[in-house]
């Protein structure tokens, strides 16, 4: 009798701990709970930062509330369509393999994308050789396992800050080792306008930028996808990867002076199905990597600045596949198509 009771208890525990999927795969309940995460909603019109943010009816309001929150694996951060925010979006935390944190939109698709306008926000951890500041609308620092999608990003104001080098989305790693899977998909990044390109070619700045800085601990990216983005009216680079842990970092143009003293390439980059239009320099330029797939991208009217160069090019890379891309309408300066 005691043996039957013990078996029944063990069987019950097994049923609680294990879920059997239709295909016969066994997944622990703990794993299922982690994947679920929490969905947070942000509404700049009807939200309130005193809310818990976990439903559309109890949405947060401000970027300040978002930036003060450390998100966990499986969480979703959802911005309401038709709303806009001015300032910096810089959420904290990291996801995990197979369980990223997601930025997405909610609401009626006819209302357009939620808009993040950098609007002259400046940080003090910059790489600018002259001013030691940077200006960006979206910023991640030493984080990994994020999916950034469905938002609109802009960063242009007609003020004295136009001479600060600007970014749309800046993803930075510094003295952190290998950082994985911060993916940017289906975003609209436009009007990232700053210092005139004639003064500096702006390598390492632009619409969507992955930047490795520092010289103390070798740092790189691994398994990064940039896909389906529309990048328009950017007077530096459209999509750019650059690192201090490479052989050539163009210090006169990028402002990078703290070279790592060795080579530590990023691995497995996918740059696919992006449309870059009216970009002052290159539409796409990865550097310091091993294994890159660059395919099905369009560069329309790029290389339009006085110091522009080839609309799609790469530097200090190994095992590059560049295929099925389209380039047209390039400017007359610098290198050509």
Model-derived regions: residue spans:
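Right-handed parallel beta-helix/beta-spiral solenoid domain characteristic of secreted/periplasmic
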Residues: 78, 94-163, 191-197
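Right-handed parallel beta-helix
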Residues: 100, 144-155, 178-193, 218-237, ...
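Hydrophobic core
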Residues: 11, 15-19
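Acidic Gly/Asp/Thr-rich repetitive segments characteristic of extracellular carbohydrate-active
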Residues: 42-80, 84-85, 89
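Glycine-rich beta-solenoid repeat tracts in large extracellular/virion proteins
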Residues: 87-95, 114-115, 119, 136-142, ...
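Sec-dependent signal peptide cleavage junction
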Residues: 19-33
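Boundary/junction segments of secreted and surface-exposed precursor proteins
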Residues: 33-44
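Bacterial N-terminal signal peptides that target proteins for export
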Residues: 1-10
């Amino acid at each position: 009798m005691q043996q039957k009771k013990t078996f029944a208890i063990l069987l019950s525990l097994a049923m609680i701990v294990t879920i059997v999927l239709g295909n016969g795969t066994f997944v622990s309940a703990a794993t299922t709970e982690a994947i679920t995460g929490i969905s947070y909603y942000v509404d700049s019109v009807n939200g309130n930062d005193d809310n818990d943010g976990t439903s559309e009816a109890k949405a947060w309001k401000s970027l300040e509330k978002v930036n003060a929150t450390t998100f966990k694996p499986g969480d979703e951060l959802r911005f309401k369509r038709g709303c806009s925010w001015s300032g910096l979006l810089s959420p904290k935390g990291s996801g995990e393999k197979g369980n990223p944190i997601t930025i997405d939109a909610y609401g009626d698709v006819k209302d357009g994308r939620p808009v993040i306008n950098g609007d002259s926000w400046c940080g003090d951890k910059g790489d600018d050789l002259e001013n030691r500041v940077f200006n960006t609308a979206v910023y991640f620092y030493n984080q990994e396992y994020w999916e950034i999608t469905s938002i609109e990003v802009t960063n242009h104001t007609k003020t004295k800050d136009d001479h600060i080098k600007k970014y749309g989305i800046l993803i930075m790693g510094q003295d952190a080792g290998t950082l994985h899977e911060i993916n940017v998909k289906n975003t609209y990044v436009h009007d990232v306008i700053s210092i005139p390109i004639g003064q500096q070619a702006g390598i390492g700045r632009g619409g969507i930028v992955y930047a490795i800085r520092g010289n103390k601990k070798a740092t790189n990216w691994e398994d990064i996808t940039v896909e389906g983005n529309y990048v328009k009216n950017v007077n530096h680079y459209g999509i750019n990867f650059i690192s201090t842990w490479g052989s050539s970092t163009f210090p006169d143009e990028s402002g990078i002076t703290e070279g790592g003293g060795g080579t530590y390439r990023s691995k497995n980059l996918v740059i696919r199905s992006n449309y870059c239009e009216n970009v002052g320099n290159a539409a796409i330029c990865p550097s310091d990597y091993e294994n890159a797939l660059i395919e099905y991208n369009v560069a329309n009217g790029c290389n339009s600045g006085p110091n522009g160069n080839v609309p799609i090019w790469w530097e200090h890379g190994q095992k590059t596949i560049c295929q099925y891309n389209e380039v047209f309408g390039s400017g007359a300066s610098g290198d050509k198509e």
